Amino acid sequence: REVDESKQEENRMFDVVALGELLIDFTENGLSQQGNGLFEANPGGAPCNVLAMLQKLGKKTAFIGKVGDDFFGRLLGETIQKVGIDGRNLIYDSEIHTTLAMVHTFADGDRDFSFYRNPGADMMLREDEIDMNLVRNTRIFHFGTLSMTDEGVRQATKAAVLEAKSQGVLVSFDPN
């Protein structure tokens, strides 16, 4: 059996597949001439941040999630493509906007997040939209807490976790 599992492991297409939020973090970036805070739009979302770092380390990764078919969603899609993350299961929703987060950084480096997702596209991912072949063909399946905050995406996430486990895929959870 160990030989079979090791062979199966070798044949996996991806090192890590992550499911969850892909959003825009607006981070403080100085003051305007009028003294108002300036904010910079940065790609964010813990599951995809993990994938981006793994890509830099030479790992093969893929993302499963949903963004709005809007300026920010397209920016996020372009960004994951540029860093080499497989985005074949990134879904663009024409009815719901991409989730936004305002990030306040305190003097000690700690951060506070205010999410604008009422709902956000990431919350609307459905089980039938998940390419389970990605879940089956990875060594590690990773997900985070935000994909557990709304019933629809929670059910989709649970289905992906169960599929991963049934295929002997290691499941990783970020309680972030």
Positions of predicted regions on the chain:
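N-terminal amphipathic/basic-hydrophobic helices that include classical n-h-c signal peptides
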Residues: 1-11
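Glycine-rich phosphate/adenosyl-contacting loop at the front of the ribokinase-like
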Residues: 9-86
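Ribokinase/PfkB-type carbohydrate-kinase core domain
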Residues: 10-18, 81, 107-176
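Solvent-exposed alpha-helices and their adjacent loops that cap or buttress functional pockets
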Residues: 31, 94-95, 105-107, 133-135
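Acidic, glycine-rich active-site loops and adjacent beta-strand->loop/helix elements
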Residues: 66-72, 96, 119-121
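A short, structured active-site edge motif that brings together acidic residues
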Residues: 89-98
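Short beta-strand scaffold segments in enzyme catalytic cores
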Residues: 100-104
